């Protein structure tokens, strides 16, 4: 059975920078999502890490660590708060395209993610360079969706 706290503790021994952040994130086990994700709870204004324990089953410890780093980086880089793109109404909004852009930005720095994670240079992002900002990837995704409607429909 997967115990998130064990793997968070291992991560913090290697990466103490994330200790304060980890204590501020509510961790919620759920089967309502297939993987893991962070969000802001609008009622409490706190970060929440939602995770499906089945997603972590069968991963190596290195993969589990990189998935946790991936989620923590979303908080550190303000991907779910201040840097959200502005929609047509002038409101900041989380979109699938922004989520993919932020995943590309983070994942280009992580080498032990499980198969299936979006990465620059792989699959539909084969022509995307590594180590760009989320905003860079977002602009590229928008342009690719404009140039190729089928690409945009996948978002």
Where in the sequence are the language-model features?
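Short, functionally important secondary-structure microenvironments
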Residues: 1-66, 72-155
């Amino acid at each position: 059975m997967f115990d998130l706290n064990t793997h968070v503790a291992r991560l913090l021994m290697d990466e103490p920078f994330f200790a304060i952040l980890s204590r501020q994130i509510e961790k919620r086990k759920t089967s309502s999502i297939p993987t893991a994700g962070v969000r802001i709870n609008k009622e409490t204004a706190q970060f929440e890490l939602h995770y499906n324990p089945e997603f972590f089953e069968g991963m190596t410890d290195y993969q589990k660590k990189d998935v946790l780093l991936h989620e923590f980086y979303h908080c550190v880089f303000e991907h779910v708060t201040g840097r959200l793109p502005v929609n047509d109404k002038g409101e900041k909004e989380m979109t699938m395209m922004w989520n993919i852009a932020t995943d590309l930005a983070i994942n280009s720095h992580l080498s032990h993610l499980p198969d299936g994670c979006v990465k620059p240079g792989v699959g539909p992002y084969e022509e995307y360079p590594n180590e760009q900002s989320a905003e860079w990837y977002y602009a590229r995704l928008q342009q690719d969706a404009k140039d190729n409607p089928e690409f945009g429909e996948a978002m």
